UniProtKB/Swiss-Prot annotation:
Keywords, ordered alphabetically: Cytoplasm, DNA damage, DNA excision, DNA repair, Excision nuclease, SOS response
Organism: Halalkalibacterium halodurans (strain ATCC BAA-125 / DSM 18197 / FERM 7344 / JCM 9153 / C-125)
Protein's UniProt name: UvrABC system protein C
Statement: the UniProt record of this protein carries the keyword Cell division: no
Sequence ranges assigned to domain UVR in this UniProt record: 196-231
NCBIfam families, per database record: PRK00558.1-5, uvrC
Length: 591
């Protein structure tokens, strides 16, 4: 533990507040809240942690804290800080999933529309609905019942909706505010309290039309009633009071948490939201943070009631959300919470089972690859690829796959030092020599298989260094590509021969992943090198800019493009003399 962190830990207050963990660059990587800052922050640096939390702690180079007057204030501050800084370890609610709502617009002549965006525009929102189809079906029903305006802008003459009785045509005829308000109130009543009253009214109108021998109107009303039943009775009644409520349940294990939210509208369960994410604090605290973010950051409409599982600080949530919050102990509401909890537990178990199955499948692919090649199982695979443009800025890269999975800590980058011009074979010899001479000197583990992104020539170059120069008997294979630059053949042996592999096999897919990854890594490194070289060359001809100032400019701007966008004042702010800044600015504008 760093000395300055030790000193900070000794003076932490025993008050509520938020803490901000930073990495070496000063970037905020995690934000948390605590009832007692002293206890919570110290817990990160003492005792044992799971691998996931240990990874977070390993990146902490410093921390700050903000004291608040209460736990609720700390919770609100935490959510605001997460929203502002978007720390990489605060990964709750990263998805962009949004649900459809029905909206009554706040206009002189209101419209009923479906939307996924909730805005503070004076409109009335109803939902959420499980999908766009359900929202549109309900809207279609209401359009048949209440002839509100349909057009976004009023046309010069009546449209089709007027002729089919679904619009009063305020574009041509006068529609009073009282008429609009009555329809808005009836739609609101329908969407908030259900369709039973509307159904009774329609039945009365249907019978009256039949008595008056207006059979066409009676048939229209009968069809509308049938359509209403088809739309509204698709959901099973869960609770009889028709209150809109959200039901929360959660489960946690092995450093992961699953939260499930059931949306109950008009007594019916219409949809659920599932979130699975890693957590680093106490489970109950992260659960509270999730609830706050769910409403305050994702803009979900707050319902009439929120149901929570036992052990949750309901009073704190009620204070935060300003809605009725309950922890039910019996009856239908308790059953709903229990179902949400059970579903959260099952979703978490399913996640772990899928991870385990994927790991088993990956290991199986490694074993099958060894069998196909006639070599011992290659648990550690190292792959190489070269990258250059007509011999300029030549580089090479190596990736390591252990048990079939990439291990990025073992990746290596190489600038080619001894080769001039575009010579792929000599570049391969240099890199293979540098890699394995070093491993031998340091007495480190050698790979079970070496993969070369190339054909027979590259394989021969690698084998020459390994077998003839270093006396190593590591198998070397090559991955040849077709005319569409896709992995097509596996080559092995001396001389290299094609190893038959089915293109849809797990082992072929593993090789494809390895080839794609080493190619990506090499290409990225080459672009960085080329950009840096160009950056340096631009500055070479500017008097007054030496190596120190080059590094300063590179660190500050990052690219020539950013430098070209800079003004002379931007250069002066870096303590560069005015004459040098003007020369640099003029040179960049001519590039």
């Amino acid at each position: 533990m760093k000395d300055h962190i030790k000193q900070k830990l000794t003076v932490l207050p025993d008050q509520p507040g938020c803490y901000l963990m930073k990495d070496r660059q000063g970037t905020i990587i995690y934000v948390g809240k605590a009832k007692v800052l002293k206890n919570r922050v110290r817990s990160y640096f003492t005792g044992s942690h799971d691998a996931k939390t240990q990874r977070l702690v390993g990146e902490i180079a410093d921390f700050e804290y903000i004291v608040t007057s209460s736990n609720i204030e700390a919770l609100i501050l935490e959510m605001n800080l997460i929203k502002k800084h978007d720390p990489k370890y605060n990964v709750m609610l990263k998805d962009d999933k949004s649900y459809p709502y029905l909206k009554l617009t706040n206009e002189e002549h209101p419209r009923l529309v479906t939307t996924r965006k909730l805005k503070k525009d004076g409109g009335k929102y109803f939902g959420p609905y499980p999908n766009a189809g359900a929202a549109n079906e309900t809207k279609k029903l209401l359009d048949r019942l209440y002839p509100l305006r349909k057009c976004r802008t009023l046309p010069d003459k009546v449209c089709l909706y007027y002729h089919i009785g679904q619009c009063l045509a305020p574009c041509v005829y006068e529609v009073t505010p009282e008429q609009n308000e009555q329809m808005v109130q009836e739609i609101t009543r329908f969407l908030k309290y259900g369709h039973k009253e509307v159904k009774v009214e329609l039945e009365k109108k249907m019978h009256k039309a039949a008595e008056e021998l207006n059979f066409e109107r009676a048939k229209e009303l009968r069809d509308t009633l049938g359509y209403m039943e088809a739309v509204m009775e698709k959901q099973t009644m869960m609770v009889n009071d028709r209150v809109d409520r959200d039901v929360f349940g959660y489960a946690y294990d092995k450093g992961w948490m699953c939260v499930q939210v059931f949306f109950v509208r008009q007594g019916k369960l219409i949809e659920r939201d599932v979130s699975i994410f890693p957590f680093y604090k106490e489970a109950e605290e992260d659960f509270l943070t999730f609830i706050g973010q769910f409403y305050l950051q994702k803009d979900h409409i707050k319902p009439g009631e929120v149901l929570l599982p036992a052990g949750t600080d309901a009073a704190l949530v009620e204070q935060l959300l300003d809605v009725s919050v309950h922890i039910p102990k019996r009856g239908k509401k308790k059953e709903l919470v229990d179902v949400a909890m059970r579903n959260a537990t099952m979703a978490l178990k399913e996640k772990f089972a899928l991870i385990e199955r994927n790991e088993e499948r990956t290991i199986k692919a490694v074993e099958q690859l060894g069998e196909a090649m006639g070599i011992p199982t290659p648990y550690r695979i190292e792959a190489f690829d070269n990258s250059n443009i007509q011999g300029t800025d030549p580089v090479s890269a190596m990736v390591a796959f252990i048990d079939g999975k990439p291990n990025k800590k073992e990746y290596r980058k190489y600038k080619i030092k001894t080769v001039t011009g575009p010579d792929d074979y000599e570049s391969m010899r240099e890199v293979v020599r540098r890699r394995y001479v070093r491993l031998l000197k340091e007495q480190r583990s050698l790979p079970d298989l070496i993969v070369i992104d190339g054909g027979k020539g590259q394989i021969a170059a690698a084998q020459e260094i390994l077998h003839d120069e270093l006396g190593l008997s590591i198998p070397v294979c090559g991955l040849a590509k077709d005319e569409k630059h896709r992995t097509s053949q596996l080559l092995l042996g001396d001389p290299p021969q094609v190893v038959p592999l089915k293109r849809d096999s797990h082992e072929f897919y593993l090789l494809q992943r390895i080839q794609d990854e080493v190619h990506r890594f090499a290409l990225t490194f080459h672009r960085q090198t080329r950009s840096k070289t160009f950056f340096q060359s631009v500055l070479d001809d500017v008097p007054g800019i030496g190596e120190k100032r080059k590094r300063q400019l590179l660190k500050h701007f990052g690219s020539v493009k950013k430098m070209k966008e800079a003004s002379i004042d931007d250069f002066l702010a870096l303590s560069i003399p005015k004459s040098v800044a003007e020369t640099l600015y003029n040179k960049l504008q001519t590039k």
